[in-house]
Regions:
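Membrane-water interface at transmembrane helix exits
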Residues: 30, 62, 97, 123-128, ...
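Hydrophobic cores of alpha-helical transmembrane segments in multi-pass inner/ER membrane proteins
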Residues: 52-62, 115-124, 204-213
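Aromatic-anchored transmembrane helix interface
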Residues: 50-51, 81, 85-88, 102-125, ...
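Juxtamembrane membrane-interface segments at transmembrane alpha-helix termini
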Residues: 22, 34-45, 117-124, 149-154, ...
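Membrane-interface helix caps and helix-loop-helix hairpins in membrane proteins
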Residues: 40-41, 98-107, 236-237
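Alpha-helical transmembrane segments of multi-pass inner-membrane proteins
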Residues: 8-13, 88-95, 118, 137-167, ...
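Transmembrane signal-anchor hairpin modules in multi-pass inner-membrane enzymes, especially those
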Residues: 1-92, 104, 131, 138, ...
């Protein structure tokens, strides 16, 4: 199994060598289509997503060295300023913690900064023109389309073979995280598609719906229309957080 993920990392590395934005597109596919239970053990005790983010970070540093990206440009970007402001609020929230000790909170925040705050900063820094933005949007669209079609497919066949296999493979490392591939709520069969848990998928789907529906209204393209329809269906069959 590790060989497959090494191939994914290798592809990401090659894409980043060409342009960092290509690696960011690879991260989009990985975040949406590969559950976060996938680890790089025994090579390293980190998730596949963290490995991809690390590669992107290396090449973003390269872009800074060769002035393809400037610190002034990053700091002056309104979107990145908002992210940094949010990061400062998270740091201040440590003072309000009641359940965890200080060292644990720092560890959780460090992981959150790496996996959730750094990627959007890297994406914004890597987009240099409209073509880059369209490429990233197309990657999101394709990933959402695959994710929603597969989610509908799992409900039709009554099982989630992809997630079941990954849960079975990583059970020794994440036995507490294993959940049924399909669940039932109020008599409705629900699924989590390519996400580890339906809660995560349920959080993702409304955001995906807003994005694809907005661009359908903007472009009137049939691909956006079908993705909007599939996303709408999945919001109902997820049964969690939607």
């Amino acid at each position: 199994m590790i060989a497959i993920w090494l191939v994914v990392l290798g592809i990401t590395f090659v894409l980043c060598m060409k342009r960092t934005i290509y690696g960011c597109c690879m991260l989009v596919y990985a975040r949406i289509l590969i559950p976060d239970i996938v680890r790089l053990t025994p090579l390293a005790d980190i998730s596949l997503n963290t490995g991809i983010i690390g590669i992107i970070g290396i090449f973003l540093f390269r872009d800074l060295l060769f002035q393809k990206v400037t610190l002034n440009g990053l700091v002056n970007d309104k979107y990145i300023r908002n992210i940094l402001f949010f990061a400062i609020l998270l740091l201040l929230s440590i003072l309000l913690g009641t359940c965890l000790n200080f060292s644990n909170q720092i560890g959780y925040l460090k992981q959150y900064f790496i996996t959730d705050l750094f990627p959007p900063i890297a994406v914004v820094a890597s987009i240099r023109n409209n073509e880059d933005a369209r490429l990233l949007l197309k990657s999101v669209l394709i990933a959402v389309l695959i994710n929603t079609v597969y989610g509908i497919f799992t409900v039709i066949i009554g099982t989630n073979p992809y997630l079941f296999f990954l849960n079975l493979y990583y059970a020794s490392d994440f036995s507490k995280l294993i959940d049924d591939s399909l669940s039932s709520r109020s008599g409705i069969i629900g699924t989590s598609s390519t996400f580890r848990h339906a809660n995560f998928w349920g959080t993702f789907l409304p955001l995906a719906f807003v994005l694809v529906f907005y661009y359908y209204r903007l472009t009137k393209k049939k691909l956006f229309l079908w993705t909007t329809i599939f996303t709408s269906i999945c919001i109902f069959i997820c049964t969690k957080r939607t």
